[in-house]
Amino acid sequence: MDQYSSSLVDTSLDLTIGVTRMRVEEDPPTSALVEELNRVSAENKKLSEMLTLMCDNYNVLRKQLMEYVNKSNITERDQISPPKKRKSPAREDAFSCAVIGGVSESSSTDQDEYLCKKQREETVVKEKVSRVYYKTEASDTTLVVKDGYQWRKYGQKVTRDNPSPRAYFKCACAPSCSVKKKVQRSVEDQSVLVATYEGEHNHPMPSQIDSNNGLNRHISHGGSASTPVAANRRSSLTVPVTTVDMIESKKVTSPTSRIDFPQVQKLLVEQMASSLTKDPNFTAALAAAVTGKLYQQNHTEK
């Protein structure tokens, strides 16, 4: 039996021989790769730290550069600005302008001063707005206010808040006088005209010029003006020009009182002129005064 068994051929296969050899052969490359990976990781970490340090240094240098540039700009601005702010006589200004090439700077400075002055003048003109109320008849639709000045109408329109139209006037002396006027009836009372003045006249009232000229002519002829009317009309008949212009006699000897021309306010004169022109008794009183004066003059000459 033992002999028979020993004579048989062993046909079994050892399947584990090759695998064991492959494992033994693969062990050395795996460890080498792990070591290489660790080395590369360490190097990468080191490079990352170096890059972070470089970025920090770059930011610090950039910040320092910006601060230096700002300081340089401020220093240059301080060096250039004092000649502009300094106020010196005309010769020093001319010299500084010549040194800096300041012809353009001088002209620009003058232009800036002119613009500032113009803006201030425009602001002052805009602030001078006045409003005056005039009593008229409701049937009057002309929207004309007799305030002593001459006006030119250049427009009219209807507003939303008032059924009455609004008329626009400008001074007859325009463009030398830039005063404008808006006239419209009051919403509460249609018999009241509301005149809004924008600006201030730069010339005297035409009626004042005529009255002063008439008074000068009368005084040069040696005459004296009088107003023999009732006491309640005396105050309103002291200013009219007609009485002064028509009486130029050299032989008036009756004791009369001389006309007084006080310096009244413009608003008072405008109100007085408006009330006199609309008073129906004013014409009759003026005619009576002139007739009485002419009669007195003829009686004295005889």
Swiss-Prot record:
GO BP annotation list: defense response to bacterium; defense response to fungus; negative regulation of DNA-templated transcription; regulation of defense response; response to molecule of bacterial origin; response to salicylic acid; response to wounding
Keyword Nucleus applies: yes
Places the protein is found: Nucleus
Pfam families for the chain: WRKY
InterPro entries documented for this protein: WRKY_dom, WRKY_dom_sf, WRKY_plant
Known DNA-binding region: 140-206
Single GO term (MF): transcription cis-regulatory region binding
Gene3D superfamilies per UniProt: WRKY domain
Keyword Transcription (UniProt): yes
Coiled coil: none
Cellular compartments per GO CC: nucleus
Keywords: DNA-binding, Nucleus, Transcription, Transcription regulation
Function: Transcription factor. Interacts specifically with the W box (5'-(T)TGAC[CT]-3'), a frequently occurring elicitor-responsive cis-acting element.
Family indicated by similarity: Belongs to the WRKY group III family.
UniProt protein name: Probable WRKY transcription factor 40
Species of provenance: Arabidopsis thaliana
